[in-house]
């Protein structure tokens, strides 16, 4: 009995230590300090993007933020949610028939792969078109295939965002083309991406740099798709070897937007930058932030449930639920400043 009590106390003490160490990060989320103030106090590099965040992909810990709760237009990083929901709720082997709305409902000057009304394409190929070439008509068609209509899919997007804790996100379409009522934040996009990365299939689609769509019923030529995220291309000046995937976005109203994730030194980080003058700035900002965190932080596992017997872990968890509102913590990872 005494041994169990000691285990309970130890569990609680380590959990409280973890929570207390995370408090400054939570405070930083809502800070109104200017970017220059934040950079001056933390030593992080100066960045140009209006909003940014670095989040630990395992724990959700915020390591860096700049205006991360300020609403921004997301542009095509919207497609992270679209792809994730398609994988979660759709049939990758199903055949999509392009509707008139999907083909002609988009701005033809925006990103597309020239799919035509009545053309048939697999759900899998449509996802590659979305994640590599940012094909707007493919995103619309995926929405119709999964939910029966664009409107139903958008409702699913918003319901999912809300369930993930996104408080400043509202979607009106599946592709991110500009709409004044289509917005999110860097923080919310990090939450959405963290959830998407729990899907192995999503990670596989997002990590591809090249894909071929075979001839269809209305097109005799193979479509060659290449990755639009230049941090993943070895021949690019922005190539970042640790980058495992991501999604770019740009509209005149949104500016440059980018979500990327990278893994190095046993750390997996999500970086979101929004409101940049161009995508080149997204790349340089993201690389600078990644380099700083990977060079100055390390991931420390504080404890795991298996280190305590079930009775002790359950009792301690109930205490944390009552006093801190914490859900099951399981294995806790903390990114620690090495300096």
Where are the model-predicted features located?
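A general lysine-centric signal
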Residues: 6-7, 66, 79, 247
